[in-house]
């Protein structure tokens, strides 16, 4: 709708000519936006006549992203979206057992976004848990000390445990010198969101280029126990020369995260009903050189990002 110079409101079709909008009666009138001194004004909607709890119930069947969009439609929608009944549906059913009782929130919406933005340590520090903000899917990172298995990690001449402020866990392992490099980690899929495709990542930092390991393709596998695993090769740094770069184009390269750590995708799996165990492994035993300079924060499981958006 556009305000005319004569003070009357008129609609404009694709050719710029004024015409009456079909179905513009008060019973079927849709939300419209009109210009009024630069302010955006939402017109009345049939939905505004519904009880607020009814609107909340409808919105709870969408997604957190859709709910936030709906809140901008009108004051009625905003109030409905902010209700605890909506965000209780977006939170996982077991959230009360994952969030410490010492953390108090004024609403379920505040709780939801707090879990998204501030991962929670669970299982006595064995895992880090958070939610994916756009859809509420559960994400986990395994602690190297409590939920992973690393060859020779208890031998001080090969690995050492260090504390760094940017890590989620109290201690993380730093590789000093090994020939046989092997890291494994897994978890019960009932802790993850069902009906969801997940990707597994190794989250790490390197020192001095990670000698004899950073530029070597490392074997990675991910899969549900008892089923065929996916296999690929990853780099912790990347090839050191152009010839090797040409030979290993299909090797997964690491990427830098917003938190400053690096990550490399190990593989994917589909969590159908949550009745399985997912295992991951990272192995490099082919090159007979002493490897060093790798700091592991953990193995992370989070929903796979779709390449296509509708």
Swiss-Prot record:
Region feature (Disordered): 1-34
Name of the molecule in the record: Putative F-box protein PP2-B2
Alphabetized InterPro entries for the sequence: F-box-like_dom_sf, F-box_dom, PP2-like
Domain F-box: 44-90
Stored SMART domains: FBOX
Superkingdom: Eukaryota
PROSITE patterns, A to Z: FBOX
Entries under Gene3D superfamilies matching the protein: 1.20.1280.50
GO molecular function: carbohydrate binding
Taxonomic lineage of the native organism: Eukaryota, Viridiplantae, Streptophyta, Embryophyta, Tracheophyta
Stored SUPFAM superfamilies: F-box domain (SSF81383)
